[in-house]
Protein backbone atom coordinates (compact mmCIF):
# COMPACT_ATOMS: atom_id res chain seq x y z
CA UNK A 1 0.00 0.00 0.00
CA UNK A 2 1.39 3.37 -1.01
CA UNK A 3 1.61 5.81 1.90
CA UNK A 4 0.33 9.35 1.67
CA UNK A 5 -0.22 12.26 3.98
CA UNK A 6 -3.70 12.27 5.47
CA UNK A 7 -5.55 15.57 5.16
CA UNK A 8 -9.22 16.46 4.78
CA UNK A 9 -10.20 15.49 1.24
CA UNK A 10 -13.87 14.50 0.99
CA UNK A 11 -15.33 11.58 -0.95
CA UNK A 12 -18.87 11.39 -2.22
CA UNK A 13 -20.23 8.39 -4.06
CA UNK A 14 -23.67 8.27 -5.58
CA UNK A 15 -24.80 5.83 -8.22
CA UNK A 16 -21.96 5.40 -10.70
CA UNK A 17 -20.34 8.71 -9.70
CA UNK A 18 -17.29 9.44 -7.57
CA UNK A 19 -16.63 12.98 -6.43
CA UNK A 20 -13.54 14.14 -4.57
CA UNK A 21 -13.50 17.59 -2.98
CA UNK A 22 -10.16 19.07 -2.01
CA UNK A 23 -9.43 21.95 0.31
CA UNK A 24 -6.53 24.32 -0.28
CA UNK A 25 -4.24 22.29 2.00
CA UNK A 26 -5.09 19.10 0.09
CA UNK A 27 -4.17 20.77 -3.19
CA UNK A 28 -0.89 22.03 -1.75
CA UNK A 29 -0.09 18.49 -0.60
CA UNK A 30 -1.01 17.09 -4.03
CA UNK A 31 1.34 19.60 -5.67
CA UNK A 32 4.16 18.76 -3.27
CA UNK A 33 3.80 14.97 -2.91
CA UNK A 34 1.83 13.96 -6.00
CA UNK A 35 -0.71 12.14 -3.81
CA UNK A 36 -3.29 12.91 -1.15
CA UNK A 37 -5.57 10.45 0.60
CA UNK A 38 -7.82 9.53 3.48
CA UNK A 39 -8.42 6.41 5.54
CA UNK A 40 -11.72 5.19 6.99
CA UNK A 41 -11.31 2.66 9.82
CA UNK A 42 -14.24 0.26 10.17
CA UNK A 43 -12.46 -1.84 12.80
CA UNK A 44 -8.94 -2.60 14.02
CA UNK A 45 -8.13 -4.55 10.86
CA UNK A 46 -10.60 -3.31 8.25
CA UNK A 47 -9.88 -0.07 6.42
CA UNK A 48 -11.14 1.74 3.34
CA UNK A 49 -8.79 4.16 1.57
CA UNK A 50 -9.35 6.79 -1.07
CA UNK A 51 -6.57 8.61 -2.86
CA UNK A 52 -5.98 11.16 -5.57
CA UNK A 53 -2.68 10.91 -7.39
CA UNK A 54 -0.94 12.71 -10.25
CA UNK A 55 1.23 10.98 -12.82
CA UNK A 56 3.29 12.69 -15.49
CA UNK A 57 3.25 9.58 -17.71
CA UNK A 58 -0.52 9.06 -17.86
CA UNK A 59 -2.49 10.69 -20.67
CA UNK A 60 -5.98 9.97 -19.33
CA UNK A 61 -7.79 10.10 -16.01
CA UNK A 62 -7.99 6.66 -14.43
CA UNK A 63 -9.70 5.00 -11.48
CA UNK A 64 -8.83 1.74 -9.74
CA UNK A 65 -10.19 -0.19 -6.77
CA UNK A 66 -7.58 -2.54 -5.30
CA UNK A 67 -7.13 -3.82 -1.72
CA UNK A 68 -9.93 -1.68 -0.26
CA UNK A 69 -8.56 1.45 -1.95
CA UNK A 70 -10.16 3.73 -4.52
CA UNK A 71 -7.45 5.58 -6.40
CA UNK A 72 -8.09 8.32 -8.94
CA UNK A 73 -5.08 9.22 -11.08
CA UNK A 74 -4.88 12.50 -12.98
CA UNK A 75 -2.37 13.26 -15.72
CA UNK A 76 0.01 15.86 -14.28
CA UNK A 77 -0.72 18.39 -17.04
CA UNK A 78 -4.48 18.26 -16.36
CA UNK A 79 -3.92 18.42 -12.60
CA UNK A 80 -1.56 21.39 -12.84
CA UNK A 81 -3.99 23.40 -14.96
CA UNK A 82 -6.76 22.73 -12.45
CA UNK A 83 -4.62 23.40 -9.35
CA UNK A 84 -3.03 26.60 -10.67
CA UNK A 85 -6.12 28.33 -12.09
CA UNK A 86 -9.64 29.25 -11.01
CA UNK A 87 -10.95 26.12 -12.74
CA UNK A 88 -13.38 24.61 -10.22
CA UNK A 89 -13.35 20.97 -11.26
CA UNK A 90 -12.36 18.18 -13.59
CA UNK A 91 -15.04 15.78 -14.83
CA UNK A 92 -14.36 12.62 -16.81
CA UNK A 93 -16.39 9.55 -17.77
CA UNK A 94 -14.52 6.25 -17.99
CA UNK A 95 -15.37 3.62 -20.61
CA UNK A 96 -17.14 1.67 -17.83
CA UNK A 97 -19.55 4.59 -17.41
CA UNK A 98 -18.04 5.65 -14.08
CA UNK A 99 -18.19 9.44 -13.78
CA UNK A 100 -15.31 11.04 -11.88
CA UNK A 101 -15.46 14.59 -10.59
CA UNK A 102 -12.52 16.19 -8.79
CA UNK A 103 -13.24 19.67 -7.50
CA UNK A 104 -12.12 22.42 -5.19
CA UNK A 105 -14.03 22.54 -1.91
CA UNK A 106 -16.19 25.59 -1.28
CA UNK A 107 -17.94 26.54 1.95
CA UNK A 108 -21.68 26.12 2.08
CA UNK A 109 -23.42 29.27 3.17
CA UNK A 110 -25.99 27.29 5.16
CA UNK A 111 -23.44 25.85 7.63
CA UNK A 112 -22.52 28.64 10.03
CA UNK A 113 -20.44 26.33 12.26
CA UNK A 114 -18.21 25.09 9.38
CA UNK A 115 -14.55 26.16 9.44
CA UNK A 116 -14.25 28.10 6.18
CA UNK A 117 -10.58 29.09 6.49
CA UNK A 118 -9.42 26.27 4.21
CA UNK A 119 -12.01 26.65 1.43
CA UNK A 120 -12.03 28.69 -1.77
CA UNK A 121 -14.19 31.60 -0.62
CA UNK A 122 -13.66 33.85 -3.63
CA UNK A 123 -15.67 31.55 -5.93
CA UNK A 124 -18.11 30.13 -3.38
CA UNK A 125 -21.09 32.26 -4.35
CA UNK A 126 -21.33 30.54 -7.73
CA UNK A 127 -20.76 26.97 -6.54
CA UNK A 128 -22.84 26.12 -3.46
Label every PLM stretch briefly.
Residues 2-5:
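Short, positively charged and aromatic/hydrophobic N-terminal segments
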Residues 59-94:
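Mid-chain, well-packed structural core segment of small domains
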Residues 87-128:
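C-terminal charged interaction modules
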Residues 23-43, 82-93:
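Extended intrinsically disordered, low-complexity coil regions enriched in Ser, Thr, Gly, Ala
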Residues 23-25, 32-33, 75-77, 103-105, ...:
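Surface loops and adjacent helix of pleckstrin homology
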Residues 46-60, 64-65, 102-114:
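A short, charged
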Residues 11-13, 18-22, 70-74:
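Short, structured motif recognition centered on aromatic/hydrophobic residues
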Residues 34-56, 120, 125:
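A low-complexity, Ser/Thr/Gly/Pro-enriched, surface-exposed linker/loop concept
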Amino acid sequence: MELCTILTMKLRMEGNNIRLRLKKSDIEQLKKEGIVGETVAFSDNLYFYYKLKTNQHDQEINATFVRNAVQITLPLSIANTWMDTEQVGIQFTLDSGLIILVEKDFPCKTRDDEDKNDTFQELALNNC
